[in-house]
Curated annotation (Swiss-Prot):
Single GO BP term: endoplasmic reticulum tubular network formation
Annotated segments matching region Necessary for interaction with KIF5A: 271-361
Organism, scientific name: Homo sapiens
Protein's name in the database: Protrudin
Acidic residues composition bias: residue spans: 276-286
Keyword Metal-binding: yes
Length: 411
């Protein structure tokens, strides 16, 4: 009987339940609102406008802390220290009230005295959403909107990168990845707590202000510049004498004059080969060959000074010589000249610091005097034109010279 009742009740209940199911079922989910990137950019621009006074104040503080105007920064530092040490509690309350009332008065005057533009004038003067009225009532064109979106994404990416770097640095300090930095950080915190407990608040503020102004790198830069200028004013004669008189060469008779290699002719000023070839060729003979070959190429391109008269007459008398033989004679003559000019320092030591040349300590030849130096002592670059080269490429191409030759050529 029970089963029959259940079977009978099944079809009776189903008609009553089925019509109520659609009424009790939840409505179909509505489509989620689409994300509008341009509205996000407009909100960001409005936020920039609202925070513009704070940004200007931060720029002013950074301008003072970086000592862009040393006198103004010094007066600000001293004035704040005097205020921190002399003002009592009542004076501080007065300063707080003044700091509240002055911005309020300025904002009221700005709002009252500002001219309100109509919509037509605003649309005519519209430009890249700079003011708040432009953002609220003006409409941007498609190129302007795309430019705003791109600028926003670039700024957002830079901000997130800086934030990630800051968080990583904080985690490194907190996790003691660098014990020195972490110990300094926690030591500074403990020192600050002790200072707040032991010293009065006015002295704490004075120390903090002095640290911000006098403890940065820009302050030491300004001090070093003023010290250098003061020394130059106190002894200008010594400075001029140091610049005007180069170090005298070693005079040891005729041999000493030959070794000192005096001022070179324009033909000899066309310097030897490139630095790469000089560094790759370790033995002396390979180094000389690289100098000779590249020197010949530079001479042919630059059309240097003519050969001596005797050589020219000999070439004219031998009219049957071909171009290859003429070139061969020039090669032999310039090779002999370069070998005479090659420095006497063939023992593998740097002329400047006396370091021994090795696989790691490469030999480098000064393109002006020809002496052998290491890469550290011969690291000054000068254009070939300063050495007398007249080719158009000489204005762009540079060669390595030693310190003394660099001072001589740069005058």
């Amino acid at each position: 009987m029970q089963t029959s009742e259940r079977e009978g009740s099944g079809p009776e209940l189903s008609p009553s339940v089925m019509p109520e199911a659609p009424l009790e079922s939840p409505p179909f989910p509505t489509k989620s609102p689409a994300f509008d990137l341009f509205n996000l950019v407009l909100s960001y621009k409005r936020l920039e406008i609202y925070l513009e006074p704070l940004k200007d104040a931060g720029d002013g503080v950074r301008y003072l802390l970086r000592w862009q105007m040393p006198l103004c920064s010094l007066l600000t530092c001293l004035g704040l220290n005097v205020l921190f040490l002399t003002l009592n509690e009542g004076a501080w309350y007065s300063v707080g009230a003044l700091m509240i009332s002055v911005p309020a008065l300025l904002g009221y005057l700005q709002e009252v005295c500002r001219a309100r533009l109509p919509d037509s004038e605003l649309m005519r003067r519209k430009y890249h959403s700079v003011r708040q009225e432009d953002l609220q009532r003006g409409r941007l064109s498609r190129p302007e909107a795309v430019a705003e979106v791109k600028s926003f994404l670039i700024q957002l990416e830079a901000f997130l990168s800086r934030l990630c770097c800051t968080c990583e640095a904080a985690y490194r300090v907190l996790h003691w990845e660098n014990p020195v930095v972490s110990s300094q950080f926690y030591g500074a915190l403990l020192g600050t707590v002790c200072m707040l407990y032991l010293l009065p608040l006015c002295w704490v503020l004075t120390l903090l202000n002095s640290t911000l102004f006098l403890g940065n790198v820009e302050f030491f830069r300004v001090v070093s510049e003023y010290r250098a200028s003061l020394q130059q004013r106190m002894n200008p004669k010594q400075e001029e004498h140091a610049f005007e008189s180069p170090p005298p060469p070693d005079v040891g008779g005729k041999d000493g004059l030959m070794d000192s290699t005096p001022a070179l002719t324009p033909t000899e000023d066309l310097t030897p080969g490139s630095v790469e070839e000089a560094e790759e060729a370790e033995p002396d003979e390979e180094f000389k060959d690289a100098i000779e070959e590249t020197h010949l190429v530079v001479l042919e391109d630059d059309e240097g000074a003519p050969c001596p008269a005797e050589d020219e007459l000999a070439l004219q008398d031998n009219g049957f010589l071909s171009k290859n033989e003429v070139l061969r004679s020039k090669v032999s003559r310039l090779t002999e000249r370069l070998r005479k000019r090659y420095p006497t320092n063939n023992f593998g030591n740097c002329t400047g610091c006396s370091a021994t040349f090795s696989v790691l300590k490469k030999r480098r030849s000064c393109s002006n005097c020809g002496n052998s130096f290491c890469s550290r002592c011969c690291s000054f670059k000068v254009p070939k034109s300063s050495m007398g080269a007249t080719a158009p490429e000489a204005q762009r191409e540079t060669v390595f010279v030693c310190a003394s030759c660099n001072q001589t050529l740069s005058k």
